[in-house]
């Protein structure tokens, strides 16, 4: 509701932003040249609400203009279209991360994607329900988490414990995080922490609490739907 939040936002607008982002990132990927794999990271509050109550997993009411069944089908179709588009450029890998807005329905979606793409040799969908995920490429170790459940000061230790072998054979380590609806980079214990913003607009709760963000997110390109590009000629 524009007069309440200062921004007009509905499902049509949000879907348009998502599709524009996919096109923009595909253009960026093509500029890179030899990309070996695309990590499609989308489960950071993708569906925003978690089920029939139209609230977050923890029960905070959310604004939505769809019934929960419509929301799931709409979001799922967006994800399928995105993967189909990305796989034209490089093999795609996607996985689950636990987030606080739609922890359950995000997992249902990753399972549906696994079934949908089960016969695709260039699409890998992991249904591991672990709340965090790690990927190693050469001497780079990437950690993915929502950063709602995990305390920031504990994340460096979690990476060392959960990825003992990969920790010992890598030089560069990063966490790609979400949750705070802002873009921030910080180094903690030799690990780079990157918080990525969102392409979503303002809703009642975020506006009431004063969480106002820049309108230039689509221009910058780094968002919750995060693409980690693994280049075969990249030693970082």
Locate the predicted segments by residue:
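Active-site metal-binding loops of divalent metal-dependent hydrolases
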Residues: 1, 44-47, 99-101, 147-148, ...
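Intrinsic low-complexity, intrinsically disordered segments enriched in polar/basic residues
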Residues: 2-4, 234
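A broad, low-specificity signal for short, low-complexity segments enriched in glycine/proline
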Residues: 3, 56-57, 103-104, 154-157, ...
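Core catalytic region of metal-dependent phosphoesterases/phosphodiesterases
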Residues: 5-123
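Intrinsic disorder and flexible coil segments
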Residues: 41-44, 50, 67, 73, ...
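Conserved beta-sheet core of the metallophosphoesterase superfamily
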Residues: 113-124, 128-129, 136-236
